[in-house]
Amino acid sequence: MSTAARVFVARLAGAGVFDPKADQVGRLRDIVVLLRTDRKPPRVLGLVVEVVGRRRIFIPMTKVSAIDSHQILVNGVVNLRRFEQRPGETLVMADLLDRHVTLVEPGEPKSDAATTDRSTVTVMDVAIDRQAYSDWEVSQIYVRLKGRLRRRGESRIVDFNDVNGLTLPTAEQGAE
């Protein structure tokens, strides 16, 4: 099984997670990312996998050896401790999908995008790319624009930097 360079997260929902001996560990339920305060794309920390008994565990991306659209291959020892979301962590399927964000039009400043009905889009899917040394980052976002009169709007794939609303707000320090 070869590792895909880019994978869309919603297509992985429910995919089987296997160990090197082809025994099923569980099924993928979500992907954990770390949103950043700067304009850098979120970094993928790991997978939330549902094992026997509907128990959800965390598998770090360093243990993932291959990702395909239908299955995920992990190596090493898997810790079966129950997954608990930490502060600063964001679940892609639970928190990012169906979120309303602002689409930055070409020529518009990235931080001062005017929010209009036309520039507000809904996140439908998120693409993650493999970087060097087993690091994965969010690279592209599949969005849907608002349609007219209860119709679906146009959908398109945009780069992460072309949307506002998926980064953490910067902490302002005031001198008083």
Q: Where are the regions a protein language model picked out?
A:
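Peripheral interaction segments used for macromolecular assembly
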Residues: 1-176
